[in-house]
Amino acid sequence: MKSARRAAGLVSGLVAASALALVGATPASAAATWVLVDHPDFPQRICVHPERGWPSTYFHLPISGYWDTTIYGEVRNLPPGSYSDGGAVHPGDWDEDRQEFVGLVHVSIAPTPVGEYIAELWASDGTDTQTVPVVISVKEDCLGD
């Protein structure tokens, strides 16, 4: 009798789980929760020569957590004449074991005067937008220091 009840319980549990899978239900904990990763003591940094700039390079777009829509990224507040073509991290890019992904955001840095420029890397899923600072160092010798 106990084994019949146990079998009936298992069958009803399997039927309920199958029904939820068929209607596409996801647990509340699977809601999109992502973070644009920031390391304040070690911001992303690139160095360029003032006369050459860097016509095509990338900043990392480090996303941690879970997302179910595309997260777009771009860099703003760049030195004059510079631009960003942006980048994206798609839901399928997500590493389920690590719950993170590092995408790439394109930038082209124009020749610009020597100095240190603080730009802003932003990421958005269309609802939430997050930002972190990135540093562009412009100097004659990027290998010195």
Whereabouts are the PLM-identified features?
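Long beta-sheet-rich domains in secretory-pathway and surface-associated proteins
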Residues: 2-7, 14, 18-145
